[in-house]
Structures are given as C-alpha cells and as structure tokens.
Amino acid sequence: MRATLKNAWKKAEQKTPLHDEEAGYARPFEYVVGWKSDSIQLGDHPGTQRGIGSDYRGTINLVDYPDARRMDLRQTIRDPFEQVQVRQFNQDSTTPIYAVCDLSGSMQFRGRQRKLDTAVEIATAVANSAYNMGDLFGFIGYNQQVLEDFTLPLSRNYHQSKQTIALLHEYHSLRIGMEGVTDMPNFLGQTRALVFWISDFHMPLQVIEKTLLAMSAHKVVPIVLWDDEEYKKLPKFGFGTMIDLETGRNRTLFFRSEVKAKFIHAFHARRQSLEALFMRFESPALFMHGDYRPELMTHYFEQAM
C-alpha cells in the first residue's frame, strides 16, 4: 500500500511535454459581468460611457449633444423650454479579465492528471473567452512570491498569453509554498475586473480571507481544483505514506476504514468552510474534480451572476 500513495509524488516529478497546441484548443465559455464598465474602449459589456449602445440613459439638449439622428420627438414636444431633445445611450465597453494561478507545490499533485495542467487549460480557456469577447486579459502566477516570468499585464496579445501560460506544462517546482498569494492583489489594476482565481486552496483560511479582502474592488471567481485520489481513493487497509508536496515532509500511516473515513470527512468539512468563506465575499466557489468543461463555467455564471 505504501507505493500506492507515493505514486502522486513520483508522478509529480515526471516531466510533462509542452502542450502548446493542446492548450490553444481550450474551449471558451460564456461569462457575464454584473456591473457597468467605465472603460472608454468599445466592447460587449454594459458601460458608463456615453456612446453607441442599447443602454438608455436619458435625453439631453441637442446643443449639448448635436446628433439629430437621435432626436426624441415626444420629449421635444413636452419640453417647456421648447428645446430639441435627443436620446442618449451608454456604449458597450470592455472589462479587464484576469486569470490568477497557484503555482505552489501542491498543484503538482497528479491523479489522473496533474492539477497544474488542469489549471493551465482553465487559464487558457479564460484567455480564449476574453479574446472572443474583445476584453483585455492578464495573467498572474504565484507561489512563494509573484513570479514575473509568469505574469502578464492586461492586453489583447492573445498569442503571447497563450504561449506564456503553456510554458507552465513544463513547470515542476516541488517543496515550495504559496506565501506570494498575499502580494498577488497588488498586481491587479485599479479598475474593477473579473478575476478567476485557480487553486486547490490548500492554504490557511486566514490567508484566503486576507487575500479576498485585498481584492474586494474586484469580482472574484474561485475555481477549486481537487482530485478524488487526494482523499477518496486512499487504501482501506495497510500502510501508506502521505507526502506534503509543498514541504516534502512525509508521514507513514496504517490505514483502515475508519482512518479513510476521517480523511473524507475532513475534506467535506474543508469544503464547507471554503464555501462559507467565499460566500461571505459574494464569490461562490466552483469546485472542479475532473477535466475542464466549458459548460460548467457557463453554468456557473448563469447561476451565480
């Protein structure tokens, strides 16, 4: 049984070939922004800037907004000062989109697939979706610190984003923590953005809460990557070695049904704690136990936004 639990450690150390082409085919999903963007750039989301759009904002004097094509006859007739009134609309604008990725040691866990490879696919799908919507996309990777080599400012450079994210298929750093997460919010812009936070969230709840507070100006979508082999597929009977991928520490346990049940219960309790914490910040979590599926992401926005 000892070898069974060590497989995740051994698999995490194996090199994975670069999957640039596979990452590029990460299917996009549909997302919804629940606020009005103040961007001056034309996009697909409701905005606050005056311009071409379908969001009616009222009427104004023709002298102040000389566009006779938008003349409002009814309001013009009703105007006590006999001024010609024209309709005003808010233009559809862009919204900043970020994918924030946990690159700590625990993301090297491999069940059927390495967690980090799943995160790469999700981050690429976020980039694809932002590109389809005409939005700006940025990427931030962190472990013990925010990694500049895996941090991209907001841009429409789709190919650079895809190529940089794909490099993470060859990222295999073990025994490394996640302390940089508390500095990560400093790399987000000041404009309200949609932030996809991709992690297994195997970190203290106090750290998560502190980070959410620092990102309170943004809309955060926590994507929780858990693998059934972490807790559901433990041995029912026999010796096993549990290894912490972030510290390298290991502990040998004698497994029996009661011990396995405690692990499962602990994960369920952890999930409830995470869900409660995220809901306090109006950021319901999306738990992913298997492969990335775009319909799950789309459904999330249909239910949560």
What are these regions (language model features)?
Residues 2-42, 60-66, 75-77, 86-88, ...:
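Exposed, interaction-prone extracellular/peripheral surfaces
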